[in-house]
Structure formats: C-alpha cells, structure tokens
Amino acid sequence: MKYLNIFKSKVIFSSFLIFAFTKDAYAYLDPGSGNAIICLILSLAGAVLYYLKSVFYRIISIVTGKKISHEKNEKVSIFSEGKNYWLTYKPIVEELIACKISFIYYTIDIDDPALLIDNEYMHSRYVGTGDRAFAKVGSLKTPIMITTTPNIGCPTYPLRRPGKVKKLCHVWHSICDSSCYHLGCLDHYDVALTVGTWVEDSLRQVERIRKLTPKTVVPVGLPYFDELKKNYDLRISDSAQKNDKNSAKTILLAPSWGTKSCLRVYGTDFIKEVLEEGYNIIYRPHPQSLKVEMDFVNNVISDFKEYKGFSFDHDPDATESMMKSDMMISDKSGVRFDYAFIYEKPVLSLDFSTDFIDAYEAILLGRLWGDTESELIGIRLQPENRNMIMESVKKTLQYSGKEIKNFREKVLCNYGCSSEHIVDWIKNEIQP
C-alpha cells in the first residue's frame, strides 16, 4: 500500500505539471463546455488510476508469488449503483471507518465519490458496467451485504441475489413504506433497514399476501438525513438564517418530471398569479427534467423571467434555495417530506389521481403512502380546486413548524444519527 500511495502521488504531481506549465492559447472556452471537459478529464483520470492500481497489484503478485486481496475475509459489503446514492452511503461508510470495521464497497459508477476515499478499512472497487460487473457483485461472499438498490434477484433486474451472501439488507432512501416500492422488488431481501417502526405493517401485509419468508425488520431511520441535518446545522450556525420577516415571502416550486409534474396537470398560470401577488418564486425543476424535457423547462423560464420575483435554480445542491424559501409547492414528489422534516417548513401539495400504482405494492395495500400524510406537513389540493391555489398558498404559510416536527418524530426514528444505529446493528451481527 505504501508503494501504491507513492505511485499515486507521482501520477497526480505529473498531471499537475502538465496542466500548470502550458503556453497561452488565446482561445475562448464557454463555462458549460469547460465544465464538461473538466468532468471528462476527472472521469478519465479516475479510470486510469484504478486501472493502474490493478496493474500494480498484479505485478506485485507476480514478483512476490502472493495474491494480494483485501476482500478475502471481510464480513460486510456495500453495493452502490453510483454517485446519485452517495448521500445515503456516505454516513454509513464514515461510521464503519470510525468504528474500524473493514468492508468492501463495489460500485458500477466510475464517478462514485467513494472511489476517492483511501482508507485501510475501506476496500472500494469500480467493477465496471454490464453483465460482467453484475457477475462480480454476484460473486460476493460477505455474510452481510448493504444496499439501497431494490430489485436484486428479480427477473427484470440484471443482478441476481449473491448466493454466498447470508443477509441481503435493503436500506431505505426515502420516507415511505413498502406501498411506494415496485411489486416484488424486496422479495429476495433478508433484512429491511426501515425509516421507522410503522413501516413493518406494510411489509408484513405483502409477505402474507405473497406467502414470503418474513424479513428481519430493523427501524434505523434515514442515513442521508444524517448528512442533510449536518449540512443544515452548519448553514444555520454560519448565517443564523437571517430572513427578513418584513420582506416578501419566497416559494420554492419543486415539481416532479414528466406527466407526474404538477405543472403538467395544473398548468403554469398559477405562477403568474402568485408572482403578481408580490411573492417570490424559485423554480427548481427535477434533475430528470433538465435531461429529458429541457424545452418545457425553458418555456417556463421564458414565460416568467421578466418578473422581478422569479428565479431559476439548477444547482445540484438544493440547500440554498430550501433555506431561502418560506414554503414549497410540489406534487407527489418525495422531496416534500425532506423539505418539511429538515427545514420544518410547510408544503402545498398539488395532488392528482394516479393511474400508475398497478406496478407498485400499493395495489395490494390499497393506498399509496404520502397522499393523506401530505396534509400533516401543509395543505393538499386537488385539480378540481386549482382556482384555490393562491388562497392555499396563504393558508400554507400559516402552517406551524411545530406540527411538522411532531409528525417527523412519529415517522422518522434516529433523526440525524441513523448511520450509528445501522453500524451498531452490523457490529452485533458480525461479532463472534
């Protein structure tokens, strides 16, 4: 490991020299293209580094006649689909390292931030993509495998359940019960690390209906809330949240994408009405909207950009907009509960009937969690009452943060310290 670290340092230093001492090109590069090129360079550098790392270990193995493996005796593994789920895994990874528990971390994303961590207790590997990658994950032999990925073992998902893993554990990454999961996607898991005790009822109902072997259910909370709360506490201490009570109220408009967006169902006329009433609106589209429906997003921006109170936010980190706003307008998006629980601010849910629950466990349970619960974090409106949006905005702003906090305490256990409880459970499971 010492020689590998020296090798890494030389590669990084050499790369620095190449880019630091170059002649002036007198060329212009727009920020968007520049950002894309930098991301490409970093991704390529990561891929090259991990390739060279594997070559280094292979050479050492040939020279010494010994096979180098960090994975031989590990009792815990983590499987990640990539950087989009790092917020869930980061607190768990940090807690495992703090407790000096060695573990394997497999990812199918070369941009996964976990690959940048160099620690003696964490043995991370980019396994590639496609069938060979999933075959590698399927060959894991650790007694415990932690993942927030559902569907493992299902016919429609390429990853079979690892045959040598004794306890396949699913950790929740949103506030919901099993009604919000696709049919059968948790059938092959042994352990459910849930957000709270109340989730067990829905899991048991599904198990009885499909005659499944009962899972071990462990209420641990949401690990990504550990990170969100930590970031929020830091921002609060830095800024003291100096919102002027006499200034215009700010509304964060955070719709879902595609046909499930409130802007598709309710239209966009209400935005004009809210702005003309003197409110500020921060329009923050779903990240997927920026990929697949940018024309629609641009039309919304074009329609309202002349209004002084209208702004557009596409920063990957939503913290600034969430802190600046006084309430949120959304639809069925799970971000409603993140916003309400972290910032203790109310939400106006522009609801609508669903025709997609046939694919979810909700079809067995008779309801989709989050519909009526949205009334406990603010106001819930139906399309036939769309003319009442402005009135509902005013009512939502009167909603008490104390009521939201009380609901959070009923729904979410171990608020801000979920990862500690997850690792405590792991320690109890792996001890001799």
Residue locations for each model-derived region?
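Donor nucleotide-activated moiety binding/catalytic core segment of transferases
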Residues: 129, 294-337
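Short acidic-hydrophobic, aromatic-tinged amphipathic segments that line or gate anion-handling sites
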Residues: 124-130, 310-314, 376-386
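Conserved catalytic-core segment of nucleotide-activated headgroup transferases in glycan assembly
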Residues: 84-97, 223-300, 383-386, 397-401, ...
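Catalytic binding pocket for nucleotide-activated donors in carbohydrate/polymer assembly enzymes
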Residues: 214, 334-410
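Active-site and donor-binding regions of nucleotide-sugar-utilizing enzymes
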Residues: 75-230
